[in-house]
A protein has these predicted regions:
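Short loop/turn segments immediately following beta-strands, especially the blade-tip
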Residues: 173-180, 277-282
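Conserved beta-strand positions in repeat-built beta-propeller and related beta-rich domains
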Residues: 25-26, 31-36, 72-77, 117-124, ...
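Flexible "stalk/tail and boundary" regions
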Residues: 67-69, 84-85, 131-137, 220-230, ...
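Beta-rich, blade/repeat-based domains predominating
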Residues: 13-28, 57-72, 98-114, 141-159, ...
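A short beta-strand motif characteristic of beta-propeller blades
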Residues: 7-13, 49-55, 90-97, 137-143, ...
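A short loop-to-beta-strand structural motif that recurs across blades of beta-propeller domains
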Residues: 40-42, 78-80, 128-131, 169-171, ...
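Hydrophobic alpha-helical segments and helix pairs
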Residues: 87-141
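Blade-level signature of beta-propeller repeat domains, shared across WD40, Kelch, NHL, RCC1
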Residues: 243-294
């Protein structure tokens, strides 16, 4: 039996089509996230309970703060830099720009600021890949990916977790900060279809991972042994990702409102949620621009 958590609050009424990729910005003390299909990048300020947004021409799969005064955006054909208002957009590196129908999806930095992110096609065929993006270039870590999604690390940085949603599981591998490309994934935990589709995730200081389940109306925590320990019951069905406020046990959760034309059916769908889960999250790093002409 897992501990059931229900006291989830609406943090921001964003009504995203496909809210995704929440990440805490330590420098600005704010949360960034994206609406992939709505083509927007959001910034939520919990101290004022307010948010701002800017639109993008391409679909943003992820937004990552950098070690300079800029944001990194994972867009359809690669990674870009812009300022915090979405201005001065410039491509940093092309990723699969030659593969028709593919786009960047979820991305996250390791403890040394190196970016891991993946691509996907139509969500049904394994046309995507998983990449390490650092030092001015990109290295393919895994091929034949269908829907590249959640990424997380253990608190000691010795394990990397990864989700290709089509596999209905979380993969893991030993990880070395000295040799980050040396990754050999194997299955960590499989999920029944009744859980929904595994999407984004994050990790906590006790070694657990928090997995968002699209179509499952829940975020679930699994110990480092793969045992289900906590279930956050959500008031909406399409749960996409989650991220901790750095240094706290406050978990932010993004959601979607796909194919919900009547808002009365699910009035809270697509909003940003928050809940104190009682376990502190693993801090996330900004993207290190070393090696890039930026």
């Amino acid at each position: 039996m897992s501990l059931i958590l229900k006291n989830v609050d609406v943090a921001a009424e964003t009504r995203c089509q496909l809210g995704e990729g929440p990440v805490w910005d330590v420098k600005e003390n704010r949360l960034h996230f994206v609406d992939i299909f709505g083509k927007k990048v959001y910034t939520f300020n919990p101290s004022t309970n307010s948010f701002t947004s800017f639109s993008t021409e391409l679909s943003p799969g992820a937004v990552i703060p950098t070690n300079k005064s800029s944001l990194l955006l994972a867009l359809n054909d690669g990674v870009y830099l812009c300022d915090e208002g979405g201005n001065n957009l410039e491509q940093l590196l092309e990723i699969e720009g030659d593969i028709q129908g593919n786009r960047m999806n979820d991305a996250k930095c390791d403890a040394l600021g190196r970016l891991f992110g993946g691509t996907m096609g139509d969500g049904n065929s394994p046309t995507g890949s998983f990449y390490l993006i650092a030092n001015g270039g990109a290295a393919r870590i895994r091929e034949n990916v269908t829907v590249s999604n959640g990424i997380a690390w253990s608190p000691d940085n010795k394990v990397i977790y990864y989700i290709d949603s089509a596999l209905q599981s979380v993969l893991h591998s030993t990880y070395s900060l000295e040799n980050p490309a040396d990754i050999k994934f194997k299955t960590f935990v499989d999920f029944p279809s009744s859980f929904g589709i595994p999407d984004g995730m994050c990790s906590d200081v006790e070694g657990g991972i928090w997995v968002s389940f699209f179509g499952g109306a829940a975020v679930r925590r699994f110990s480092n042994k793969g045992i289900l320990t906590h279930t956050i019951e959500m008031p909406v069905n399409q749960i996409t990702s989650c991220a901790f406020k750095s240094g706290t046990s406050m978990l932010f959760i993004t959601t979607a409102s796909l194919n919900i034309e009547d808002k009365a059916i699910s009035p809270l769908a697509g909003n940003l949620f928050a809940i104190d889960v009682g376990i502190e999250g693993v801090p996330v790093s900004t993207f290190d621009l070393i090696g890039f002409n930026a």
